[in-house]
Amino acid sequence: MPAAAPLSVPRRALRAVAGLAWGAALAACSPAHDWREVRSADGAVQALFPCRPQLHERRLALAGTTVKLALQACDGGGQTWGLASADLADPARLAQALDELAAAAAANLAAVPRSSPLQVPGATPHPGSRRVALEGRRPDGEGAQMRVAVFTHGTRVYQASVLGQRLPEEPVGTFLGSLRVLP
């Protein structure tokens, strides 16, 4: 992965996403791994969540523009699970947005990202779509692991993420493996 540009915008973007996710975790507690199909706020992406997510929306800077970010997030099994989406309205901004989302996740945990290509069924193919594995520390100093998937559909970017002190492979694989864009 090439060296990241200054991260002032991406850090703000991830802080907004992480803040919303942690707020949702405090507000929405449900049994661990009570799997359910959930559609993204725009109805285009489906995922299996192990808890009942709540919707949060916020405007933030991403890829040189201001977007409305819709985040569905919940806490289950000691992890925070989220699916965020934003419409950039301009396909030329997608690569930068995917890079910023991935870089911001890494910066938030002060972690070196391990990335691999990602293909979500039905998603618009994009070379910037990827899975990112992170291990580091949250701003409060607590150790954390995070798995992130960033991808596109049309002019929208999506970020699915799981954050926790420890991430069991099976539920994380179920969640990220369930992502699909609906026809």
Place the predicted regions along the sequence by residue.
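Surface-exposed amphipathic alpha-helical segments
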Residues: 53-55, 97-113, 154-183
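Bacterial signal peptide processing site
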Residues: 30-32
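Signature of long, low-cysteine stretches enriched in small and polar/charged residues
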Residues: 52-61, 65-71, 104-152
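Coil-to-beta-strand transition motifs
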Residues: 78-81, 141-143, 152-159
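C-terminal motif of bacterial Sec signal peptides marking the signal peptidase cleavage site
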Residues: 25-28
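A short acidic-to-branched-hydrophobic micro-motif
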Residues: 71-100, 148
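Post-signal peptide N-terminal segment of mature Sec-exported envelope proteins
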Residues: 36-68, 76-77
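Bacterial N-terminal signal peptides that target proteins for export
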Residues: 2-21
